[in-house]
């Protein structure tokens, strides 16, 4: 294929338009970030501003009047074999947090199975979590940013809390994964 109707010219990123539907991933640009060719196969780079969850469908179309065959026939912008499901690149996300009535623990629900490394094995530990109460005006404080204990039931992790002082109900407990500590089965 060629960029000019007389059978000359190399294809460029501007000869293609990208789109995504479904899921949460967003394109950073509808124009590919790169292009390379090997034989009849063109590899286009896709710029995403957020990771794909695996339910998105990516579509590639030639831009109008930009792709030709040797005989000068123009490629249609409406293709039928130009879509593919994107791979899951989204790590486990927290979908729910419920604190115990006595403030001794918090249940953290993850959207999928989680592991402490990229080997898809092992159990999460207290070191995989970071806790905080960012309200500096509160008399309630955390004794440690690390949970005191951990237990698991399916994808619900119960983290033990060491709260000093008396909470008045206006505090916010923040639960985050420690840096580079919680992965899904696809090593995200």
Protein language model features and the residues they cover:
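Non-catalytic beta-sheet/beta-sandwich ligand-binding modules that flank or precede catalytic cores
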Residues: 1-188
């Amino acid at each position: 294929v060629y960029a000019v109707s007389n059978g000359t010219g190399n294809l460029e990123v501007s000869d293609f338009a990208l789109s995504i539907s479904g899921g949460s991933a967003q394109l950073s640009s509808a124009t590919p970030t790169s292009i390379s060719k090997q034989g009849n196969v063109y590899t286009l780079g896709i710029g995403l501003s957020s990771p794909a969850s695996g339910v998105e469908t990516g579509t590639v179309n030639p831009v109008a009047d930009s792709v030709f065959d040797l005989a000068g026939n123009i490629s249609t912008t409406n293709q039928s074999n130009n879509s593919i499901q994107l791979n899951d690149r989204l790590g486990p996300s927290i979908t729910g947090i419920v604190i115990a009535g006595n403030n001794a623990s918090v249940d953290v629900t993850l959207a999928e199975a989680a592991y402490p490394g990229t080997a898809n094995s092992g159990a999460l530990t207290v070191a995989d979590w970071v806790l905080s109460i960012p309200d500096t005006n509160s008399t309630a404080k955390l004794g440690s940013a690390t949970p005191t204990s951990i237990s698991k039931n399916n994808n619900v992790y119960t983290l033990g809390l060491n709260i000093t002082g008396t909470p008045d109900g206006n505090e916010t407990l923040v639960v985050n994964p420690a840096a580079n500590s919680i992965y899904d089965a696809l090593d995200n």
